[in-house]
Amino acid sequence: MLGAALRRCAVAATARAGPRGLLHSAPTPGPAAAIQSVRCYSHGSSETDEEFDARWVTYFNKPDIDAWELRKGINTLVTYDLVPEPKIIDAALRACRRLNDFASTVRILEAVKDKAGPHKEIYPYVIQELRPTLNELGISTPEELGLDKV
């Protein structure tokens, strides 16, 4: 969609160019051009927070998720400018446990701590919310493993 819009813009610029590539003054665009430019930049509907959370919980709860899909999901989730909700992290930790991938559980918890950044109250809150899951699955936090001192 974006490629087509760029092609239309390039064709329009070429059509206005003179013999030596200099742009001639073009007539003032009418209202149809304004509507067209608005359409060129629309990107569809945005996702609500609840839909975002549900999408990621569903992704990590897939019974047939493999190690590659798990890592891909974690990598994608970490690239967003947010700290994932505890229910998303819970689903990811359970997927790690189904795959017996302890290293990914530690990586997820370290990523959450890193994403919290200077807001020191976020990481303890997430760990508090995840404590029943961590105990159930037998997962230690990076602090309990001594990895925060390295």
Curated annotation (Swiss-Prot):
It is a peripheral membrane protein. InterPro entries: Cyt_c_oxidase_su5A/6, Cyt_c_oxidase_su5A/6_sf. A motif (SIFI-degron) lies at residues 2-17. One of its GO terms (molecular function) is metal ion binding. Its main location: mitochondrion. It is found in: Mitochondrion inner membrane. Residues 1-41 form a transit peptide. Keywords: Acetylation, Heme, Iron, Membrane, Metal-binding, Mitochondrion, Mitochondrion inner membrane, Phosphoprotein, Transit peptide, Ubl conjugation. GO terms for biological process: mitochondrial electron transport, cytochrome c to oxygen. The keyword Ubl conjugation applies. SUPFAM superfamilies: Cytochrome c oxidase subunit E. The modification N6-acetyllysine is found at residues 87, 113. In response to mitochondrial stress, the precursor protein is ubiquitinated by the SIFI complex in the cytoplasm before mitochondrial import, leading to its degradation. Within the SIFI complex, UBR4 initiates ubiquitin chain that are further elongated or branched by KCMF1. The modification Phosphothreonine is found at residue 141. Component of the cytochrome c oxidase (complex IV, CIV), a multisubunit enzyme composed of 14 subunits. The complex is composed of a catalytic core of 3 subunits MT-CO1, MT-CO2 and MT-CO3, encoded in the mitochondrial DNA, and 11 supernumerary subunits COX4I, COX5A, COX5B, COX6A, COX6B, COX6C, COX7A, COX7B, COX7C, COX8 and NDUFA4, which are encoded in the nuclear genome. This is Cytochrome c oxidase subunit 5A, mitochondrial. It comes from Cebuella pygmaea (Pygmy marmoset).
